[in-house]
Amino acid sequence: MEWVWALVVLAALGSAGAERDCRVSSFRVKENFDKARFSGTWYAMAKKDPEGLFLQDNIVAEFSVDEYGQMSATAKGRVRLLNNWDVCADMVGTFTDTEDPAKFKMKYWGVASFLQKGNDDHWIIDTDYDTYAVQYSCRLLNLDGTCADSYSFVFARDPNGFPPEVQRIVRRRQEELCLARQYRLISHNGYCDGKSDRNLL
C-alpha cells in the first residue's frame, strides 16, 4: 500500500502546482518599497526575455532618486546586431509612481534608435536592498489575466552573484511569477567596461 500513498502524495503535489495562480493581478510585490534604499548600482544576473531588441548581457543598471523623490535609471549592456556585430549600448528609464510604492510605470528608450522603447509596468517583486532584487513587467495581458509578453530581471549588488540562501529565495520568487526555468543567465565579462570608444553606441 505504500506505493498507493506515494501516488496520492505525487498527485497532490501535482495538483498544487497546477493550481498556481498565474494571473498578473495575483502577483505579490515588495511591501513598503523604499526607493532611496534601492538606488545605486545593480548587476543583472538573470533575465526572462521579452519580445524585441534589448540589452543582452554585461547589463549594469544605475538607479537614482532626485530631490523630488523621482526615480530614474540608466543601463548599459551588450547588444548583438545582424547576428554578428556586438556593440555596447545605453538605455534610459524614468519612473512614475502609483498607489503601490513597489509598482511603477516606466518610460524607457535606447540612446541608439534600434533599441526597444516603451512605457511598461515595472514592479519590484522582492529585494533586500543589499544583495538581490527581482523585477517584473508584463507588457501584454491574455484575456484570462495571465501575461502574454513579460520580462523579468534578477539583479545583484555583487557582479559575482549570490550566496546559496539568496539563490533559494530568488528561485521561489521566479516560481511565484510562473516563470520557473524561463530565465537565462547573464554574463559579466567586462565587454562594456572602460571608456574605449570601440563599438559604443
Swiss-Prot record:
Belongs to the calycin superfamily. Lipocalin family. Retinol-binding protein that mediates retinol transport in blood plasma. Delivers retinol from the liver stores to the peripheral tissues. Transfers the bound all-trans retinol to STRA6, that then facilitates retinol transport across the cell membrane. It is found in: Secreted. Keywords: Disulfide bond, Methylation, Retinol-binding, Secreted, Signal, Transport, Vitamin A. SUPFAM superfamilies: Lipocalins. The modification Omega-N-methylarginine is found at R139. Pfam families: Lipocalin. GO terms for cellular component: extracellular space. PROSITE patterns: LIPOCALIN. Residues 1-18 form the signal peptide. The gene is RBP4. InterPro entries: Calycin, Lipocalin_ApoD, Lipocalin_CS, Lipocln_cytosolic_FA-bd_dom, Retinol-bd/Purpurin. CDD domains: lipocalin_RBP_like. This is Retinol-binding protein 4. It comes from the Eukaryota. Interacts with TTR. Interaction with TTR prevents its loss by filtration through the kidney glomeruli. Interacts with STRA6. GO terms for molecular function: retinal binding; retinol binding; retinol transmembrane transporter activity. Disulfide bonds join C22-C178, C88-C192, C138-C147.
